Amino acid sequence: MQRPATIRHRTSLFEEATSIVEIEFASDLSLDDIARRVASSRRQLQRAYAEIGNTTFREHLTAVRMDRAAEMLGMRGLTVREVAHRVGYRQPAQFAKAFRRHHGTSPSAYRSRRTPGGPDDGPRVAFEAA
């Protein structure tokens, strides 16, 4: 059984790390970078993700990116390529593969099901990056 101080410390690390990911998901983030920023070792942060979040850093980052991508695709103002870039993917094909793995469908099919009238209904609008 872990000591309460250890649990509190790991919870704090996890919360700090997830806050950074939630804000900077489109950046080129790495576990080492986040560990430095929360003043922790790579291994301690891995443990925090595993024990507190029941996930890994990479899984969390991907989930945040995919959730944001789904939101953007639902707005219909951006192409799939633009969404890919806005959530941190340089290659749209890699984005599409990750999106399909996460959501069980392609970005285009997701958009068609979520957007009234389909992907070509209505005017195109520009969105500012968050």
Predicted regions and their residues:
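Short amphipathic alpha-helical segment with a characteristic S/N-K-E followed by hydrophobic residues
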Residues: 45, 56-57, 61, 106-107
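Helix-turn-helix
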Residues: 33-42, 46, 88
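Key DNA-contact positions within bacterial/archaeal DNA-binding proteins
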Residues: 43, 92-93, 108
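An amphipathic alpha-helical interaction segment
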Residues: 1-19, 36, 44
